[in-house]
A protein has these predicted regions:
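Structured catalytic-domain cores with a bias toward divalent-metal coordination
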Residues: 1-331
Length: 331
């Protein structure tokens, strides 16, 4: 694993070779397109490192990529492998200038010029080129998994975030998330600047952000904790049978409210160590700024991603409500 990481950090992945049954093309730095020489019935994007310090998904995807290189991992899907923010990965930082996962869908045009605004545009163009290639002989279904780890602890260690999406996701997609070991699935109800919202909104992909655990430095991740996710991804890209789920049933949530910080006087009334999915008491004032307060409603008590340190205009937390297993959007 250490050699794989070194190859990524020192621009040596381009020297990796693949079996003659796979056509490999680099669409940009850290953007690898793999097309089976035979026809394919699905196009899949696997992305990691959109936040540069989230190393476990990077190590896991490198293992999958090594299996493809050695011919040990079958590939029947058209596949785009994305290492999202390479300068931040090499620096061991979440980002250098802007949060890359807030800049997709053209939002990079309004951001301060820098590493992440350039990279968001480059990734958008690469995705467009990939789907154009995969549809050359007829349109095929599209899937995107963007793999992350979280800054704070969580009552649900592994969970999926689904972007706002007209209609519901397919039964096969929910089966993929369940087989991947997700403890919870959260459905967004508003558009956002994430990579997965971009691929879902612009290209109709079945997309999800997977949060796999805690942020750790390279070499300190226990990849056994992510074995279910790796097995499910391996089955996905090979059109194989999904591995059986060995956990308790998935819990489902829907975002009811976003807490948006609009000024520097914003305060978040939470313990800095509070875990994601903690249930807060009804009536509790969770956040305040000059013109607005946020109070917990009884039907949406669960907090996700609380962070008072975000820039003005960014999300400082989400309030969730428990949902039925079907997460269809309301009419």
């Amino acid at each position: 694993m250490e050699q794989n990481v070194n190859d990524l950090l020192h621009c040596k992945l381009q020297t990796w070779t693949f079996p003659p049954t796979i056509e490999a093309s680099w669409l940009g730095d850290g953007i690898l397109q793999l097309l089976p020489k035979t026809s394919w019935r699905q196009a899949t994007i696997l992305s990691v490192g959109v936040h540069g310090n989230e190393t476990a998904p990077i190590e896991m995807l490198l293992q999958i990529l090594q299996g493809l290189s050695l011919g040990e991992q079958p590939l029947t899907h058209a596949l785009l492998v994305v290492f999202g923010n390479l300068p931040a990965i090499r620096a061991g930082r979440r980002y250098l200038h802007n949060d890359l996962n807030r800049l997709f869908g053209g939002r990079h045009l309004a951001a301060m010029p820098g590493n992440e605004s350039r990279r968001a545009f480059e990734l958008e163009m690469a995705v467009q080129a990939f789907f154009r290639s995969t549809d050359a002989h007829g349109k095929v279904p599209r899937t995107h998994l963007d793999l992350h780890t979280a800054i704070r602890g969580s009552k649900h260690r592994q969970f999926a975030l689904l972007p706002a999406h007209d209609g519901d996701y397919s039964a096969d997609f929910y089966q993929l998330l369940q087989a991947s070991g997700m403890d919870a699935i959260v459905r967004h109800t508003e558009p956002g600047g994430t990579f997965t919202h971009f691929t879902s909104e612009k290209f109709g992909a079945q997309s999800a952000t997977l949060e796999l655990g805690k942020v750790m430095p390279f070499g300190e991740n226990d990849l056994r904790l992510f074995a279910a996710t790796e097995l499910a991804i391996g089955a996905l890209i090979a059109d194989g049978i999904m591995p059986p789920r060995s956990k308790a049933p998935v819990e489902y949530f829907v975002v009811q409210q976003s807490i948006i910080k609009s000024e520097n006087g914003f305060t978040l009334n939470l313990d800095p160590k509070i875990e994601n999915f903690t249930a807060l008491p009804a009536g509790y004032e969770i956040a305040r700024q000059a013109q607005k307060t946020w109070v917990v409603n009884a039907d949406a008590p669960y907090i996700l991603f609380p962070n008072a340190g975000v820039a003005a205009g960014q999300r400082a937390g989400l309030l969730l409500t428990a949902a039925a297993p079907s997460l269809s959007m309301p009419a």
